[in-house]
Each structure stands twice: as structure tokens, then as C-alpha cells.
């Protein structure tokens, strides 16, 4: 169950994260399972790192928050660059909700995928999010929140727009939108 938690300072203290840090989140796997080195290119971990490389020049106190298994590629790339990160490998849904709520930005950089679920989760928790044009991004996020890969820093989160649109996909109302969306695909 995902929801907004307004007091980020309490959450950051709980997870021992700096209140002055600009926290960017990524909660999906980024590495192929066969060798734990090769990037899972469909998830765009190289695009994530490219965006972080640009963003760190703008946000001097940038730190990355990662969750989930198979985060080897991003962890290795962040380590090479001496970019501070916090890795919470296996967490509960309650903890995941809290981690969304303490972020300054959630970044989806997938090249293709069905969801991603993170767009819905960030929307319902009012987490600032920008995303590549993938899956349901354009159904939930504003045009200004869609990343142009040529100018990635131009993307801007629109929290209220995403929160408003995600309401259409919550149960029970969400079943109608869900069926409508997938009937167009079939």
C-alpha cells in the first residue's frame, strides 16, 4: 500500500540519510542475471548513469538510493565515479513506500518495458519523477516530465499531474482504465 508521507526529515533520519542530500532513486534491477556484470539494457542503466553524470553538476549534494537485486552495473558505475549511494537490497513494501517518500527525484530510464510500476508508485506517493517515454509514462506523467534523451536535464517533475492521473488506475476505478488501456494494445 503506497501513500504520501510528508515528513521527509523523519524518514531520512530513520534510514541514516543526510537531510541536505539531493536523493535520486532507482528501484529496479539493472544487471543481467547470467553474469552479474552486463547491463540489462532494456532498463537503461547506462542512461541512468548518463543522467546522474549530468545532474551531479547541477546538484552538488547528489546521492543515489537503490533497492532490489541485481544492481551490480549501477553500483559499479557509481563507485567508479565516487558518487555516494545507499543500497537497500531486500526491503518490504512498507520500506519501499518510505524510500519513495524521502526522495527528491525518482528516475526511470528504461528503453522499453510494460509498466513500469515505479511510475504508478511514485505518482501515488507524490514523489517527483521523470521518465523516458516508456510503457505508461505518457498516461501518468505530464509532457514536461518525459525525458528527451538529447536534453535530459530539461525534464521537470509535475507531482500534482502524476498524482491526479494515477487516481484513474487505482482499484476499483482503475479496472476500467486498465481494461481500456490494454484493449488498445490487443
Where are these regions (language model features)?
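A charged, aromatic-enriched C-terminal amphipathic alpha-helix characteristic of glycosyltransferases
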Residues: 153-186
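Nucleotide-activated donor-binding/catalytic signature segment of Leloir-type glycosyltransferases, i.e.
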Residues: 68, 73-94
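Conserved acidic donor-binding segment of nucleotide-sugar-dependent glycosyltransferases
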Residues: 144-153
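Short alpha-helical donor nucleotide-sugar binding micro-motif in glycosyltransferases
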Residues: 98-103
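Aromatic "clamp/platform" in nucleotide-sugar-dependent glycosyltransferases that forms part
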Residues: 111
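A short helix/loop element that forms part of the nucleotide-sugar donor recognition site in Leloir-type
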Residues: 3-17
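Conserved donor-binding/catalytic core segment of Leloir-type glycosyltransferases
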Residues: 17-43, 49-52
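Short hydrophobic beta-strand element within catalytic cores of glycosyltransferases
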Residues: 119, 128-131
Amino acid at each position: 500500500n503506497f501513500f504520501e508521507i510528508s515528513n521527509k526529515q523523519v524518514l531520512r533520519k530513520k534510514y541514516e540519510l543526510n537531510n541536505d542530500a539531493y536523493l535520486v532513486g532507482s528501484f529496479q534491477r539493472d544487471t543481467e542475471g547470467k553474469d552479474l556484470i552486463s547491463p540489462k539494457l532494456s532498463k537503461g542503466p547506462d542512461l541512468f548513469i548518463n543522467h546522474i553524470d549530468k545532474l551531479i553538476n547541477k546538484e552538488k549534494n547528489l546521492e543515489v538510493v537503490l533497492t532490489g537485486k541485481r544492481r551490480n552495473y549501477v553500483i559499479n558505475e557509481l563507485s567508479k565515479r565516487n558518487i555516494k549511494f545507499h543500497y537497500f537490497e531486500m526491503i518490504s513494501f512498507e520500506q519501499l513506500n518510505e524510500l519513495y517518500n524521502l526522495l527528491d527525484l525518482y528516475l526511470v530510464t528504461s528503453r522499453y518495458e510494460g509498466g513500469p510500476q515505479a511510475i504508478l508508485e511514485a505518482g501515488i506517493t507524490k514523489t517527483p519523477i521523470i521518465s523516458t517515454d516508456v510503457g505508461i509514462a505518457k498516461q501518468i506523467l505530464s509532457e514536461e516530465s518525459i525525458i528527451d534523451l538529447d536534453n535530459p536535464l530539461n525534464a521537470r517533475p509535475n507531482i500534482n499531474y502524476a498524482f491526479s492521473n494515477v487516481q484513474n488506475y487505482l482499484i476499483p476505478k482503475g479496472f476500467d482504465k486498465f481494461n481500456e488501456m490494454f484493449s488498445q494494445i490487443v
